[in-house]
Structure formats: C-alpha cells, structure tokens
From Swiss-Prot:
UniProt record similarity statement: Belongs to the citrate synthase family.
Record's catalysed reaction(s): oxaloacetate + acetyl-CoA + H2O = citrate + CoA + H(+)
GO cellular component terms given for this protein: cytoplasm
Organism ancestry: Bacteria, Pseudomonadati, Pseudomonadota, Alphaproteobacteria, Hyphomicrobiales
InterPro entries in the record: Citrate_synth-like_lrg_a-sub, Citrate_synth-like_sm_a-sub, Citrate_synthase, Citrate_synthase_AS, Citrate_synthase_bac-typ, Citrate_synthase_sf, Citrate_synthase_typ-I
Keywords tagged on the record: Transferase, Tricarboxylic acid cycle
Active site: H306, D364
KW Transferase (keyword) present: yes
Protein name: Citrate synthase, chromosomal
CDD domains the record matches: EcCS_like (cd06114)
Amino acid sequence: MTEQSAKLTWGEKTVDLPVKTGTIGPSVIDIGALYKNTSTFTYDPGFTSTASCESSITFIDGDEGVLLHRGYPIEQLAEHGDFLEVCYLLLYGELPTAAQKKDFDYRVVHHTMVHEQMSRFFTGFRRDAHPMAVMCGCVGALSAFYHDSTDITDPHQRMVASLRMIAKMPTLAAMAYKYHIGQPFVYPKNDLDYASNFLRMCFAVPCEEYVVNPVLARAMDRIFILHADHEQNASTSTVRLAGSSGANPFACIAAGIACLWGPAHGGANEAALNMLTEIGTVDRIPEYIARAKDKNDPFRLMGFGHRVYKNYDPRAKIMQKTAHEVLGELGIKDDPLLDIAIELERIALTDDYFIEKKLYPNVDFYSGITLKALGFPTTMFTVLFALARTVGWIAQWNEMIEDPDQRIGRPRHVYTGAPLREYVPVSKR
C-alpha cells in the first residue's frame, strides 16, 4: 500500500491521517491511531464507511458489478471451475495444479465422516426445530469432538480444522435435513464429487437406488461457488470478530452461522421466493410494482437491490442461467414462479423508478426458485448458504490469524445515557 495523507479538522484541532491505497479499489483513510492521539473516535453505524482489515481474498466493485476471488472474476470461476477448486483458491491464494487439486480433493474427502456420537447429538433437538438452529448447535459442538485441531497458534491444526469444516459441513447439513423430515441419515460416499455427495446424502433413502443427476449436481456446485465468499459482510465480520478473541475455529463458524440466520442476511432468497408466491401470476405484477413504489405500503420487492452492489449483481446472471438449466432438466417448462421472475426482472430493469434507485436483481432473486426445483424446502435455503460460505469464513479467519496488525475487536459507541449520578437507597426512591 502506498501512503498519502489527509487532514481532519474539528474545532481547533487538525491531524494528518495516512491514506492507503489497495491493489484496486478506493483509497482508505487510516484512523487507527486517531483515538490514541486525539481522544476522539469516529461514528459509523453499520460500518458502511469502515474497513476493519486488509484482505487479499475477495474484491467487490459495487458500482460496476464486479466480484473477484483472488483476482479471478466470479463468472469465470462459476463457468469453468468447481467448488473445491475455488476452496483451494480462497484458502491458498492460487488456483491449484492438477496434482495439487487431486491432493486437496483427497484430503477433503478424508474428512467427510462425522463422529458417530454426532448422530446421537441430533436426537436432542425437536424434529420440527429449524435446521439452522440445529446447525448452530452441531457446528459449535465440533470442538468437543475434534479438540486436536483447536490450537489456533499451530498452522497445521488450523489447516486440519479448515479441511474438516469444508468436508463435514455437507454431511452435517444433510443430517440436519434428514432429521428434520424424519428420514435415516445417509453416510457420505467418497467416490462422488462434493456436490453429488451432498445431494445423495440429502435425497437418497436406504430402500431405493439413488443416482445423482449430473446437471443438478453441476447446478448445486455452481450455487456453492456463487456463495463461497463476499468480502466483509455481516457473518464474515462476525467470524473475524469472534476469532479475534482467540476462539476456536468451530466456535467462530458457529457464530457466523448464527449471524447468517438473520432474515436481512441469509434469509433473503427465501423471502424472494415467498414474494413470487405472493404475487401469484404475471398479470398481478403491475399491482405489486405500484405497491413497491408507494412509500406508505409496507410491501417491498425482495431479491432486488444490495447493500454493496449499485449495479447488476454478477452472481444473479449466473443464477438465472442455472435456474433455466435446472428447470429444463427436470422438465418444468411452465413454472409460474419463473415466469413471474422473468417478467418482474424485465420491468424493473426498464422502469425509471428502479433504475434511478439502482434496484437491480441480486443473487437471491433466482436462487430460491432453483433450490426449490432441486427439492429443498425453504427452511434449508440458509443452511445451504452456510455450507457454501464456510470456506470463505475459514479463509478470512485464517487470514486474520496470520495478520500481525490484527488484535481483539473492540468497537466503541457514542454514549447517550444518563450522566454521572449518585445511588439512592431503595427506601428513599
């Protein structure tokens, strides 16, 4: 990073602050020493103008609709790569050679099984428990079963924990689904690829032969790639903040899952699907467009707009193509939800109201339709998001551990409570 400087003036005080520039992207004013030198700190609710760290993993240009992983466009990775190749890239910084990929795939496969006692752990949950509640508990409990990989100061243990998390998340997610619907658990089959293995664990039953459809497996793999990492979002920041205290990796990922469960974060694809269902038919779209424009109407178009993107989410285009491939393979030619989605997207992209407000389709707009077609209930949508995002969380966590500038996270607040006052005994109040 090359350094320039900026002046901050308030009252009679003026300080020079270093300005840093990354490889690409906007310049950043470094205020790390501001409080130490001036007893003043900044106010930024939601951290919308704050960089909490340096990172070489993911770059987003929201104005241009660009998403890069280690410099590679998401479009190229989703079109030509597979999920484990992207995992290797996020973890190690480069795409693997053929030999490296073979070795990495083998090491992940080696860890797909979970401790047999985990199956009994599941029975402590109600059958109607939300799968995300189950995932929070089970992932957090992994440190009790795999305590030989919780020393964060040991690079080897961190590597083992990383592989275990990537390998075991599909198994745990499938177990959560099977437990939820009352079917027996299906063990992983390690001669299958990552996505095929997951689909088999979800949808196979002991009494029937299950053959994974390669088109559906490829779609599942692409969905995993599209959700693998997305810079310093709420759940990733949660993982980093938890990790800054020295917490073990399983606890940090469980914290990320809990944050992702929030409807404003991981639940957006479910909300988008519910919205399409509510609209019902194409001829009702104008009614809902009008409602979306009405400030006094609580209705909001879900799957449009993004906290970062002020252009078309690059993942949305890939997700739209994937949705068509899945529906075509399954022979679903007249899906009313897809018809509504296509027409709604067309109107939104040509309507001045949405263009001016930069409300473009995001990745959640088509992912709900695709996951529904694959056979997943809406309660599993966020679980699949967590499964895919685990590698991003792990890569970000590892980067934080290795960063010499990182310390325990400690945001400040602007105190607006009562000033100093004296305690009054209860008998005199």
